[in-house]
Amino acid sequence: EVETVKRTFEIARLNLIQYHGDESPEFCDAVGLPYIKAFRVQKGMNLRSEIDRYPNASGFLLDAYVKGQPGGTGEGFDWELIPQSHAPIILAGGLTPDNARAAIDQVAPWALDVSGGIEIKPGRKDPDKMARFMDACRN
């Protein structure tokens, strides 16, 4: 499995891997390539402990936990659960043009990952919402 990841990395000429599953820190480190570890954040989760388990991560993507859904649900989570991190934070989950500025001000993430919050309907982006989102991020 480690060799499969390495080979895919080489073939696709990737710069970074983003792990969204139950990969252990040992597995991520054994691959030996730069990576972002994603966590689906839920109430009561000890996110500090989870982040600390991955000292070699290049960053962390934090999204809302929704049972039975891998992500992209449009659901948010309590940003107060986000601890300081040794690596950059990418914030996802329930982001919209109306809360993008608050997300930046409160969390100070390296990046925002938005999907459903700028859609007209599932899978269809709204150019106006996208422009409003970008304006909120810049101002």
What spans do the regions from the language model cover?
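Active-site beta->alpha loop and helix N-cap motifs at the rims of alpha/beta catalytic domains
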Residues: 1-16
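Short loop-to-alpha-helix "cap/lid" segments that border enzyme active sites
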Residues: 11, 22-139
